[in-house]
Design a protein with these regions (language model features):
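Solvent-exposed, non-transmembrane regions of integral membrane proteins
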Residues: 1-259
Length: 259
């Protein structure tokens, strides 16, 4: 990219969290001391929200035309735009919720805080998210996997493929579903396509593909993906709060319309 890319690994925990808390503290001080100034007033205004959302939409469209190797989502302009949107949301909430009333501000708080949590956890979590691939052969213990760069890394669990089953359509013999039965630290679990197994807080195992033996009759091994997302539940909390706020807003509008 023309403006360079950000090394997200630098912001891995706890640096990302510390920077987020420090940013909120600075915004709070700025709002308290200069909240009536022209710059802060404009930055938290609805017009600024429209500008930021329009720029984000344009960047998303432009990002679709950029080659994958350019890593548009980690480019300085795009990340800077998302940080500006987070700062805008924070200032809007600080200004609106100075005198909080549940009946008046509850829906507003849920929507805006939900969006903020989902965005921040997505950005901070990018540095802590790991996707590893491992090849499991029947009856063999595996305790290492490979990242996207091909580097071998240790797994937190030892896994063994016990058996594998492929379900086919009787009409044309095409694969409908495939399943794998594993031992994860001697605990049995079942994997299927789009049906992962959770092995810890924010860590899931996905079944990706399989390979047949030379005769093409039996499965000799399968490929699994171990995804470590420690910020996943914070993101889910943000989404739930956003949905709750939307429902709350709709109900409030309906009640006010009947009065």
């Amino acid at each position: 990219m023309m403006f360079g890319n950000i090394n997200v690994e630098f912001f891995s925990f706890p640096i990302g969290l510390v920077l987020g808390v420090a940013g909120i503290a600075l915004l709070y001080v700025a709002h308290r001391e200069f909240g009536g100034g022209r710059f802060i007033t404009y930055f938290r205004s609805a017009r600024m929200a429209y500008v930021l959302l329009a720029l984000v939409a344009c960047c998303c469209v432009a990002g679709g035309a950029v080659p994958a190797f350019a890593r548009f989502t980690t480019s300085v302009p795009f990340v800077g735009l998302l940080v500006a949107l987070l700062a805008h949301l924070a200032l809007v909430m600080m200004h609106r919720l100075r005198k909080f009333s549940l009946g008046r501000d509850g829906a507003f708080a849920c929507v805006h805080l939900g969006i903020w949590l989902a965005m921040f956890s997505g950005m901070a979590g990018a540095a802590d998210t790991a996707r590893l691939h491992a090849l499991l052969a029947v009856g063999e213990d595996v305790s290492t996997a490979y990242d996207e760069n091909g580097c071998e890394l240790p797994l937190r669990h030892t896994m063994r493929l016990q058996r594998f089953a492929v379900e086919r359509n009787p009409a044309n013999n095409t694969v409908v579903q495939f399943r794998a039965w594993l031992l994860v630290d001697d605990e049995p679990c079942e994997l299927a396509v789009n049906s992962p197994h959770s092995v810890g807080l924010g860590e899931d195992i996905y079944l990706m593909s399989y390979h047949l033996n030379s005769s093409g009759t039996d499965v000799k091994d399968c490929v699994i993906q171990v995804v470590h997302e420690p910020w996943k539940y914070v993101t889910l909390l943000g989404i739930v709060m956003l949905l709750l706020g939307v429902v709350w807003t709709v109900k409030t509008i309906k009640v006010e319309g009947k009065v």
